[in-house]
């Protein structure tokens, strides 16, 4: 009999004993001492909720829009690579769950299911494409054009990975893809991170990034991407107000406040702590989103109160996927949705439009660990 899992931490605790160690470590771990990994979650507790009373909350509307597309709730699925390591159906199970739940999924360029396969599995799902800028720009261009053709609604370009962060668990485990898997958006063994490729004796993914991803990425590449596609462009990985302003100048449609799940530069702030700076910097000109550390419905409420249009979740989706495939992903999303609904009701919020910064204040006694 399967255990009864009722919150996100239950899922992570359970799948730790289910997944192969190197796979679990890959999904779970952060960079270096993992200070930011812990802080991403702990930071939410530094922001306290100040609920409104005597509001009619008999009916709660969670729906909102992301880049002009309607979603049932401001909880979306972030780009998590190589999901077939967690479950045989991988990204196909995830997109089907998103389709059922009426929310959006960002597909990783490094998926173990192709752009086309995911579109076929979730034809009615709201899908976005995550993009890395490769040394060979033609590779990135083809990913964008394939995503356009298959009905993906936006491009989320990752800008925080000129090199891969020092993920010590991956180095210890000499992380590589299992022999039966490959990144299915690429043809050659080297680009597909195939076990047949040569990726050294340490973290194979770090070697892959060093070989393939362009460390000379600059704002000129955002201009190039803007000329390449008419799809909305979201810059993923911004943590400073001046970078946010520069992104707006370069014509992006959104900013995803992200520290890559604490997997790149350890010691950066938790995303919830820098969110207000980014929201202030863009002056309402583009939509702002957040990922990193979202584990509860109250986390979602706090992020929206501080100005995020929606949040993206990554690891919780993997834990649900590893537990029970499509159903596990759907159950995780249902848990977050119902927790968020309750948090809204107990805060006096009938819909997401009335969620504002008066609902949260930073605890003056709380001191960040970063």
UniProtKB/Swiss-Prot annotation:
A GO MF label: glyoxylate oxidase activity
Binding site for FMN: 79-81, 108, 130, 158, 236, 258, 291-295, 314-315
Modified residues (N6-succinyllysine): 184
Biological processes, Gene Ontology terms: fatty acid alpha-oxidation; glycine biosynthetic process; glycolate catabolic process; response to oxidative stress
Entry annotated with the keyword Iron: no
Binding site for glyoxylate: 26, 132, 167, 260, 263
Cited InterPro entries: Aldolase_TIM (IPR013785), Alpha-hydoxy_acid_DH_FMN (IPR012133), FMN-dep_DH (IPR000262), FMN_HAD (IPR037396), FMN_hydac_DH_AS (IPR008259)
Domain FMN hydroxy acid dehydrogenase: 1-365
A GO CC term assigned to this protein in UniProt: peroxisomal matrix
Pfam families membership: FMN_dh
Tissue: Liver.
Short sequence motif named Microbody targeting signal, residue ranges: 368-370
Swiss-Prot/TrEMBL catalytic activity: a (2S)-2-hydroxycarboxylate + O2 = a 2-oxocarboxylate + H2O2; glycolate + O2 = glyoxylate + H2O2; glyoxylate + O2 + H2O = oxalate + H2O2 + H(+); 2-hydroxyhexadecanoate + O2 = 2-oxohexadecanoate + H2O2
Residues forming the catalytic site: 260
Quaternary structure, from the entry: Homotetramer.
Xref: PANTHER family: 2-HYDROXYACID OXIDASE 1, S -2-HYDROXY-ACID OXIDASE-RELATED
Protein's recorded name: 2-Hydroxyacid oxidase 1
Protein source organism: Mus musculus (Mouse)
